[in-house]
Amino acid sequence: LQKAAGEGYAAEVFLTAERTMEGIGFTIEGRADGIFTDEDGTVVIDEIKTTAAPTDAITEDMNPCHWAQGMVYGAICAEQRELETLDVRLTYYQIDTDEIIRYTRHFSAAELDAFLNDLLRQYLPWARRQLDWVEARNRSLGALQFPFPAYRPGQRALAGEVYRACAAGKAEQKGGTRLFCQAPTGIGKTMSALFPALKAMGEGKGEKIFYLTARNTTQAAAEDALARLRAADPALSLRSVTLSAKEKAC
């Protein structure tokens, strides 16, 4: 649909905006499927949805979230281009019949701006809880101690390298900070990786840690390491989840 739209149709347009509400900063971003100017000179936000719903079920009000997405993109676009009005169009493609159904609504920039602000206002309570949680988590990670009386030979050096890699963050010219380690069995590699990574996250050097394993035994080792950290510090504020392959879960 995007390729067939013509030369004046800009596909996959990245949109981003910064808003502050009650002291909390928000970054809103996404990709509009298409933006173009119609024959009347009106800018149109085109949101394309693929659906298997029967044709008679593809109504203008089939899914309010589809309009909401287009309206948020419209609010950002209107702000960036200093537009007074624009159109939001929903384009539905029925995969079984190849039928294309379109609906268009006209909005003022003021309407779209008010809509976006109302969404953020509804989101505020969750944002506050999230900020409070991150503050409590980082505070507890700052007080976290190594859960063993002493490091094993080579373990402190490995943990130090992991911490430095995490603390360095991304180096754009190198595609990010990478650390490749090789160590013998029994050195305590799992704790040597998790503990310093958690300490770095507690200092604001990261938001999440992904620990990827190829075997069930190494997955269990990571879970055991987290359990040991929690046992050593019952006040630790830390959330973790284990994701397994669908083939293993079924």
Feature locations, PLM:
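Polybasic (Lys/Arg-rich)
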Residues: 111-143
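Walker A/P-loop
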Residues: 168-196, 207-209
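Acidic-basic catalytic patches of nuclease active cores, encompassing PD-(D/E)XK
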Residues: 1-19
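Short glycine-/polar-rich loops that comprise or flank the Walker A/P-loop
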Residues: 84-86, 205-207, 236-239
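Conserved pre-motif I regulatory segment
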Residues: 133-182
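Walker A/P-loop NTP-binding motif
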Residues: 163-167, 190-205, 225-229
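Conserved Walker A/P-loop ATP-binding site and its immediately adjacent core
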Residues: 208-228, 241-249
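Mg2+/Mn2+-dependent nuclease catalytic core
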Residues: 17-113
